[in-house]
């Protein structure tokens, strides 16, 4: 068992984890995270933004978690409940990964216009935001201000690692 797997076992075992996946190229990496969370005995529910489904298929997360992957606020094929509130109340922790500049800006300013942002804003659970984007976008003063706002509102923002990015650049953002 790796060090990260041991830590995950300690922190997420028997916890309800809400995993928000946004539309960045790093979306495919989140399947591994979902798998590790499930392996650590977390109950993982995934919400994907409209753009995220262009990078990875919801069936991947459904297979890994055993739960329907939520991709639409107005899904008409559901049991009667206010789904974003039910998921928000269920969550012991909310993770948004990869977090695009767009979704971080929405969360920093209280904009709730899709299933992910409405659910995150409705949840009282601790929130972990993992930005992933091009270095220029990440270092943009507007993005940095939004990150500071997210921290001010009590969200934990993980600093992205540095390396070779999908666009061919080397820098921070992966």
Ranges and model annotations:
Residues 2-128, 134-174:
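A cross-family phosphate/adenosyl-ligand binding-site feature
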């Amino acid at each position: 068992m790796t060090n990260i797997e041991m830590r995950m076992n300690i922190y997420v075992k028997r916890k309800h984890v809400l995993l928000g996946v946004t539309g960045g190229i790093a979306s495919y990496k989140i399947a591994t995270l979902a798998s590790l969370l499930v392996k650590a005995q977390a109950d993982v529910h995934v919400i994907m933004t409209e753009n995220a489904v262009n990078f990875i298929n919801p069936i991947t997360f459904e297979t890994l978690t055993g739960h329907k992957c939520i991709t639409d606020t107005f899904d008409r094929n559901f049991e009667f409940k206010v789904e974003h509130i039910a998921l928000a109340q269920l969550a012991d922790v909310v993770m948004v990964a990869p977090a695009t500049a767009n979704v971080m800006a929405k969360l920093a300013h209280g904009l709730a216009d899709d299933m992910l942002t409405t659910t995150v804003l409705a949840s009282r659970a601790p929130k972990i935001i993992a930005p992933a984007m091009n270095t220029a976008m990440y270092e943009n003063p507007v993005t940095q201000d939004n990150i500071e706002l997210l921290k001010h509102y009590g969200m934990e923002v993980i600093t992205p690692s540095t390396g070779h990015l999908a666009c061919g650049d080397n820098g921070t953002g992966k």
